[in-house]
């Protein structure tokens, strides 16, 4: 594929993603917290710090992998980097493959580090990238961690996508052993099963982003790019973020589980943390905010989001993310059925 074609595809992804709406029905609504009437904590007591295995996040929120690889997406990445810098949240870039193939595209990613020299930044490659290119991707951004995205459904619906996946697990193992920063294996909106998480744990992966169904839908995005748009029936493929977090329960002591996919509100984010996530990522909400309303309004949105998380934690009478993981929740019959049929040990 030519560089112009790749740049066009990057722009198409952003345009279609921005046009997608939030899910009207979400598994986050299948969870209820138990309200206790008299909190013993004040809002100012709430500590949103999240301690991961290799670094500390001042806020349990991050701008998740989105874009890069074109002039337009360079501008988007620069604006998002300002948001990350000013609010102190972490940020991931989209797949750096374009920059690894063509050095002219490198600035569309490195602009993030240039804009936010002291922030926590995740670089991003695919599961099929050669190990030396994974190392190069980390250097490109002086990244604190490397996301490796696994996106088989997207590739299979993408007209020009990959059709070979049997080497992915072995390649992931090699990347983990060679890269000198933490490796985050990240889904792209299809969720993860306990079997996948177990396999990743066995090859030394200590971070996964379960990235469940409910947010940006890459089956729908790639189907829009197909001549006959003939694979729309796969639009609900995969596990939701809630189902994926439940699937991860047995591995939350050994691994840091990150949650993303369809997080709409601060309440959704708090539910992710209560289900065992160490941090919560969002992509499209930040993209839509910064492109439609600008940097100042996006800063206000981000600060309001974390402030509301503190208020919810106050109502739950918990001071820390660690305390939140012990809070009481009630699951709907739908989620309880998933837990029972999948044989999940969630407490």
Curated annotation (Swiss-Prot):
This is Isopentenyl-diphosphate delta-isomerase. The lineage of its organism: Bacteria, Bacillati, Bacillota, Bacilli, Bacillales. It catalyses: isopentenyl diphosphate = dimethylallyl diphosphate. Belongs to the IPP isomerase type 2 family. The gene is fni. HAMAP family: Idi_2. Homooctamer. Dimer of tetramers. It comes from Staphylococcus saprophyticus subsp. saprophyticus (strain ATCC 15305 / DSM 20229 / NCIMB 8711 / NCTC 7292 / S-41). Its cofactor is FMN; NADPH; Mg(2+). Mg(2+) binds at residue 155. One of its GO terms (biological process) is isoprenoid biosynthetic process. It comes from the Bacteria. Substrate binds at residues 9-10, 95-97, 154.
């Amino acid at each position: 594929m030519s560089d112009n074609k790749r740049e066009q595809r990057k722009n198409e992804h952003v345009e279609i993603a921005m046009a997608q709406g939030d899910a009207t029905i979400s598994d986050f609504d299948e969870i209820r917290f138990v309200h206790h009437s008299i909190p013993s904590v004040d809002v100012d007591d709430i500590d949103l710090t999240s301690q991961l295995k290799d670094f500390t996040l001042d806020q349990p929120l991050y701008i998740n992998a989105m874009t890069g690889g074109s002039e337009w997406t360079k501008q988007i990445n620069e604006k998002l980097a300002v948001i990350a810098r000013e609010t102190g949240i972490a940020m991931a870039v989209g797949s750096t493959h374009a920059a690894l193939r063509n050095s002219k595209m490198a600035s569309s990613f490195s602009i993030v580090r240039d804009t936010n020299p002291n922030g926590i930044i995740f670089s991003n490659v695919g599961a099929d990238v050669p190990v030396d290119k994974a190392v190069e991707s980390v250097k490109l951004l002086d990244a604190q961690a490397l996301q490796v995205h696994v996106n088989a459904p997207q590739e299979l619906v993408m007209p020009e996508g990959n059709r070979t996946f049997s080497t992915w697990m072995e390649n992931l193992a090699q990347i983990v052993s060679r890269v000198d920063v933490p490796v985050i294996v990240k889904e792209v909106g299809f969720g993860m099963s306990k079997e996948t998480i177990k396999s990743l744990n066995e090859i030394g992966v200590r971070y996964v982003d379960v990235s469940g169904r409910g947010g940006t839908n890459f089956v729908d995005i790639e189907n829009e790019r197909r001549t006959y748009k003939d694979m729309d029936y796969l639009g609900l493929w995969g596990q939701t973020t809630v189902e994926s977090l439940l699937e991860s329960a047995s591995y939350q002591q050994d691994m840091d589980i990150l949650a993303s996919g369809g997080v709409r509100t601060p309440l959704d984010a708090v539910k992710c943390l209560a289900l065992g996530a160490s941090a919560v990522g969002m992509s499209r909400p930040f993209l839509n905010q910064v492109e439609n309303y600008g940097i100042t309004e996006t800063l206000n949105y981000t600060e309001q989001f974390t402030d509301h998380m503190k208020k919810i934690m106050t109502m739950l009478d918990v001071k820390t993310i660690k305390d939140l993981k012990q809070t009481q929740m009630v699951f709907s019959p739908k989620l309880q059925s998933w837990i029972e049929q999948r044989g999940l040990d969630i407490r």
